[in-house]
Amino acid sequence: MECKSDIYGGTNQLLPNATHAEQHIHYHNGDGEHGAAPAATPPHPHTLVILGAGVDAAVGLPTSAQLIPSIVDWLETEEGKAIDEALRKQLRRLSFRFDKFVDDAIDRLAKDLDRERDTICRNVREELERNIHLDESQRKMGSLIVRIFQKITEVKNGAAIDEETEELIREVTGMDPTDNTIIDFTKLNYTDTFKNIITHILRSSLHDSDNPILRHVYKNLLDIEQLLVQYFYGFFTGRQPQIKTYLYISWVLWAYLVHCEQENNDNVNPNVNDDVNLRSVYGQLRGKDDIQVVTFNYTTFAAQASPSALYFNGTLTEYVDIENKNDLHFDDIHSLDLRTFFTERLPQELSLTGERIAIPVPSFMPPMKLKTVISEHYINVWYRTSEAIRHASRILILGHSIQADERFFSDMVRNNRDAEIILIDRDLDTACHNLCCTLQLSPNRYTSLVLHGCPARKYDNRITVVQADLSTTDLTPWLTS
């Protein structure tokens, strides 16, 4: 029997009309129950804290840029192999492999640079111009990338038939040119030297994803969100191969993140370790009941530190059967045996053929590029987030580089024109550039200062970007009124 997914309806399901004004907003009371939104707006905290991937990275988890290479390595472990085998047993004839995806991405970009070349070249050039903290090796790598890519662009531009040349061709030969260039670049082969240089750069970016230069190559190479977007469309087209691939990618991502949280929980949770680092971001948020936390991370660390934390993109503790409209929950992912879950529990819940169809997927936010694909659960979270941002007098952003293309969330922050905004990040230049683009400010109009021993820049008399390491930074000055 062909799998035809019913993706509409249900408490935590995908709703096609979710953006309509008549959509009902439901509040979550913290006990797993939903209720109608109260008539009066609930009180809001003075300070709002927004957590990004940099906060989890500070306690040992991979950054978003490191995610796919880390998953590839983990799938080579005994645990990873067992989970991969269990999933493939359920998802028959699955062809997707993370390691092959990485190799194909490198080969594809090395052979055909037209799609990404100009974007990478522009971003690297901007990094070279504005980042005064690059060391000599980073500047040389950046210069090499720009020079190599520019030479390709120059050759292509030089071969173009401009208007003057086109007119001369008509006058001399009486013919109208039918091509735009004098070279067929589809048949042009790069030399082995060039291919080896590009492959070296791409391979280097896999293992040095935080490099200020190489990250511009890397983010155009491997992007877990783009990967999920690519296969999420299968739920709309009814294509089983795409559905199976999405199930595999999302469950492997979930399993790897649970594995990482289990390994690092002792560093974060004082209930299991008395010597936990209370100076970590999560340690410093504990007991701050007057502060609202919004996290973009999937781990439970935010909820451990602040039970009222809002999970903007989803959480590891929830998953959903999108076919039968059932919300499912993990009581304790720290004691969860991943192998047992994938060999015993998930096979009972997942069914793609026969009379019973059931499609459980991790409760990750459906990719934002699919703007009409949102659920009632997320509308609730986003509404509460929007209200918290709107009423906050101080917004503290930690480890999250807000970018202009994140329009949905960026608009929430931009619309509060009175709040004091503090962003703390290791990369001052990039953080300033991204935040200024988001808030429509000039990145060069700032006052340079030192706050609590850290370099900082102040914009618009209310926005401060601080360069600091979140694993050691004392947040007390910003967490107190």
Language-model regions: role of each:
Residues 15, 310-312, 397:
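Short hydrophobic-aromatic micro-motifs
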Residues 34-104, 112, 377-481:
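SIR2/sirtuin-family catalytic core signature
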Residues 1-39:
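Long, low-complexity intrinsically disordered regions enriched in small/polar
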Residues 12, 22, 137, 368-370, ...:
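Intrinsically disordered, low-complexity regions enriched in polar/acidic and amide residues
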Residues 3-5, 121, 260, 432, ...:
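Generic recognition of cysteine residues
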